Amino acid sequence: MAREFSRTQRVAQEMQKEIAIILQREVKDPRVGMATVSGVEVSRDLAYAKVFVTFLNDGEPETVKSGLKALQDASGFIRMLLGKAMRLRVVPELTFAYDASLVEGMRMSNLVSNVVKDDAARRSAADRDEEA
């Protein structure tokens, strides 16, 4: 029976969970604030991992920039704790990147809901005009 997920996907999923726990409990840098791990991409040889994060106050570009810098500075510490938490021969080198997809998704959702609301208002106005 074939496996549903490849090893890299399983490792990435476990890394996402472990890094989220590490950021919540171990990283004390105030620049990181409330960081959420939204995804992890691992290379096929498990040597590199790209960690996608979002921040609580990510409306300000300076907050995002300083948060990413703090995470990159702490990547060695996070990697050491990750090595203790996971049983891997080689712990991947971590690179942190901001995940704008969540913010973009919320923006698109707001645009769609505004269009639906405007459309409903136009329909009700057109229905009132037809009745008169």
Swiss-Prot record:
Protein's job: One of several proteins that assist in the late maturation steps of the functional core of the 30S ribosomal subunit. Associates with free 30S ribosomal subunits (but not with 30S subunits that are part of 70S ribosomes or polysomes). Required for efficient processing of 16S rRNA. May interact with the 5'-terminal helix region of 16S rRNA.
Family listed: Belongs to the RbfA family.
Lineage: superkingdom: Bacteria
An example Gene Ontology molecular-function term: ribosomal small subunit binding
Keywords annotated in UniProt: Cytoplasm, Ribosome biogenesis
Annotated gene: rbfA
This protein's name: Ribosome-binding factor A
Annotated Gene3D superfamilies: 3.30.300.20
The keyword Isomerase belongs to this UniProt entry's keyword annotation: no
Assembly and oligomerization: Monomer. Binds 30S ribosomal subunits, but not 50S ribosomal subunits or 70S ribosomes.
GO biological process: maturation of SSU-rRNA
Keyword Cytoplasm carried by entry: yes
